Amino acid sequence: MNIEWFAIGVGAIVVLYILYHFIKMIWSILGLYVFYQPIDLKKKAGASWAVITGGTDGIGKSFSFELAKRGFNIYIVSRTQSKLEQTKKEIMEKYSNVEVRFATFDFTNPSISDYKKLLSQLNEVSIGMLINNVGMLFEYPENLHKTVGGIDVVANVTILNTLPVTLLSAGILPQMVSRKTGIIVNIGSVAGAAKMAEWSVYSASKKYVEWLTGCLRKEYEHQGIIIQAITPALVATKLSGHTETSLFCPDSATFAKSALNTVGHTSQTTGYINHQIQCEMLALFPECFLDSFVKKSSVETREKALAKKENKHLL
């Protein structure tokens, strides 16, 4: 009888465990993207300026426009002066009630002195929200020693995907702590959710973003500061190499709006309902299946990239 009751107890625990994770999975999709209402970001931020790194292209540019729409003054940090000027012009033409500033900064090869100068410039304004968006992707997936561009590119991807998010957070947090309000959103990638062969450095660098965000959230959770990671899957941008939208590949404007609507409701999410469904479904499969899926996807991506390069060469 005791053995029977023990077996029943173990069975009940297993069922409850499975039920808990099932409800958690459903809620991470429906609760976050259907039932929760967006918070007033500007009110929660406690200051009028939003800083966006890599804000002249793709997701970063769409974040800049969406935050301007929500009443923030916009401070863009990016590399190319002409793109910064053009983006500023476009935002101010559409949202004349906001102020737009920019700082020209190359995140691939800065010194600590360069970062100190940048942070001094940024801290001249009251920053309510920081979006650490700047990132770099390899030309196509490949074994580490075969990376196009060699160790220079490997170094750039590693540095650009980890250092800016760390140093800008460290440099801007003091004014948020003093106000006891502020929002930091760190843009990672679904690539950080699994050990991805042929994406090793990129995947590892995006896992760093997740881990750092989680640690910072614990450090500052009682100081009125929201710190959240957004880990998207495929978005139609120049960086991703995909320009056509689909059910699981939204345009950057759609993604940015959806992602910002999740801020304040969770510690980490993909930012888009269909991406969240993808991730929750993939999490149900064993690692060997994911490895096979990643391998197939990597081969297809590499073949497309090489074919595109060959076509350009022929032209």
Swiss-Prot record:
GO CC annotation: endoplasmic reticulum
Coiled-coil regions listed in the entry: none
Xref: InterPro entries: NAD(P)-bd_dom_sf, Sc_DH/Rdtase_CS, SDR_fam
Molecular functions (GO terms): oxidoreductase activity
Family (UniProt): Belongs to the short-chain dehydrogenases/reductases (SDR) family. 17-beta-HSD 3 subfamily.
PANTHER family the record matches: STEROID DEHYDROGENASE 1-RELATED (PTHR43086:SF1), VERY-LONG-CHAIN 3-OXOOACYL-COA REDUCTASE (PTHR43086)
Identification of the protein by name: Putative steroid dehydrogenase 3
Source organism phylogeny: Eukaryota, Metazoa, Ecdysozoa, Nematoda, Chromadorea
Gene: stdh-3
